[in-house]
Amino acid sequence: MNLASISQSYMSHNENERSIVPYIPPPYHPTAPALAVSASQMETMSLGILNQAMSSSAGASGALKDEKAAFGAMAEALRDPEPIRKIKRQVGIQTLKALKVELSGMRRKRLILKIIMFICANVTMATSLVGGISIVDEDIAKHLAFDGKGDWVSKTVHGLNLLCTTMLLAANKISEKVREEIARTKRDIAKRQSYVSAATMSWDGDSVTPLRDVKYGD
């Protein structure tokens, strides 16, 4: 082999090496996920709280139902991402003010209905008593209904009895609806207060510092 062929072979080898651009991978710095443990703990806690909220509430009192609703709201807060949790917290604080105002108005409305029911019940009892006595005593019956001049008294007594009985039944029905609305509003307040409390918890590893003095719609 002469020098010319050796030189040509060397030059072709160098050209092949220059035609291939070597790939240099970027530097890799292994890092462990910082929030993997706490996220897993929050999911586990969320499932446990949700299990408490989904348990049977048959025969439970209103306070226990409010408690289960609060459990469900806390489980929802633990599942939500941090930005959504902050948004819901701000909206919940504003909604709580309106709900408390509505709750005060409904309580005043129910108090007025109770006063009306008390008055109507007393008038109904009094007019029924007068009507019963007029049936037993003939003199009172003659004075109230059968002597011509006193007929208006009997009509007034029976009219008051019918009117107050009707008002009593209507007020009782409205009062029951208001009572159900109060229970629903208190439960909504409990849910939002629990969500706000869970959203304001400070998480530090395995320890949790909750917001104290949580009230359930009172």
From Swiss-Prot:
Entry-linked Pfam families = Orbi_NS3
Lineage of the source organism? Viruses, Riboviria, Orthornavirae, Duplornaviricota, Resentoviricetes
Q: Which InterPro entries does the entry mention?
A: Orbi_NS3
Q: What does this protein do?
A: May play a role in the release of virions from infected cells.
Q: Which domain of life is it from?
A: Viruses
Annotated family: Belongs to the orbivirus NS3 family.
User: This protein is called what?
Assistant: Non-structural protein NS3
